[in-house]
Amino acid sequence: MTATWEKKEGNEGVLTVTVPAEKVNKALDQAFKKVVKQINVPGFRKGKVPRPIFEQRFGVEALYQDAVDILLPEAYGEAIEETEINPVAQPEVNVTQIEKGKDFIFEATVTVEPEVKLGDYKGLEIEKQETDLSDEELQESIDHSLSHLAEMVVKEDGAVENGDTVNIDFSGSVDGEEFDGGQAEGYDLEIGSGSFIPGFEEQIEGMKTGDEKDVVVTFPEEYHAEELAGKEATFKTKVNEIKFKDVPELNDEIANELDSDAENVDEYKENLRKRLSEQKATEAENTEKEEAINKATENASIDIPEAMINTELDRMIQEFGQRIQQQGLDLQTYYQISGQNEEQLRDQMKDDAEQRVKTNLTLTAIADEENIEVSDEDIDKELEKMSEQFNISVEDIKSTLGNTDIVKNDVRIQKVIDLLRDNAKYVEATKED
């Protein structure tokens, strides 16, 4: 077999492949054995028609397509290896010759992985993230935990405040006409949650139990129901009941409830500070890594084939489908609820998909440029880490993966990211006013 690669414009080229006549004849033999099983010819049992009779009756051409199907995958795979190209999509194949006793020749128009022109990736200016945990952050976490232990208590007197939960009846109308979905009785709404139309919750504040009020709001221009988008609506609203959160004070008993390893408040705070400090340090490291990756990617120049973006979009749609499946939904149900279709969702995700592809290509190119290698020891360490993280044996992980190529690539990319951080110039983060 011979193969030649001719680069064309952009990321496309033509792969011309010639398979010797000897292999063609063998493929025709295989094709005949397959096809003859389905043929009925008077005077012969099914599947027992001699080859000469078959060709005389149907022509050898009847075997050509099956022969191509037999020859093409292997020949294309060998041609890719021989020419050392990296296809990123299925090729467009044009068979130029398939004939008994002659070479099989085909041309494949192939989109290949693009060239990456790296920019600066060392000495990148990165904001140094704060890792010290403040007393305010510690207290905020404590307050958040205590809020989960709060009981909802009916507010007998007083008005609605931010954070209260109100039980309301409402009936919405536009231009005096009620609209679908605009009415409810006994609806619980947490004020400040932002779950209603902008401006609605703010107007409920100050009302008391039994109060009635016309709440006037304007639907957002991008509202999912097009017939309501941008229109002013009036909601006749009645407050049935007001509840507030009765948050307990922190004591030794509650400290132990929040952290079974803590016997008193001081131990709880000490354990929490340690845990939050570790978490903040990890978040700071990840933020610095992300900034380094983004800057190195931004500095690179790549003409990304549309096929690579589409492949990444397919992967992202699949991942999204798996996430919403965990919430009891499927993609078709999501499309109905959101008013979107797959094409719109793909358009929405396209920029992220392109960024993902560019990032991956950039980091891989840096790994190649820096001759970064991954040892068996590196892979074993990563597998041990995965084993601890997911509580699965290393053997089971290997069995699930089939091979360690994915792990090897992940470790290689992580080494690139470490290289970016180690060679970065750190500056103090800009203080927010």
From Swiss-Prot:
GO terms for cellular component: cytoplasm. Keywords: Cell cycle, Cell division, Chaperone, Cytoplasm, Isomerase, Rotamase. Its EC number is 5.2.1.8. It catalyses: [protein]-peptidylproline (omega=180) = [protein]-peptidylproline (omega=0). Transmembrane segments: none annotated. Residues 163-248 form the PPIase FKBP-type domain. The keyword Isomerase applies. It comes from the Bacteria. Belongs to the FKBP-type PPIase family. Tig subfamily. Consists of 3 domains; the N-terminus binds the ribosome, the middle domain has PPIase activity, while the C-terminus has intrinsic chaperone activity on its own. This is Trigger factor. It comes from Staphylococcus epidermidis (strain ATCC 35984 / DSM 28319 / BCRC 17069 / CCUG 31568 / BM 3577 / RP62A).
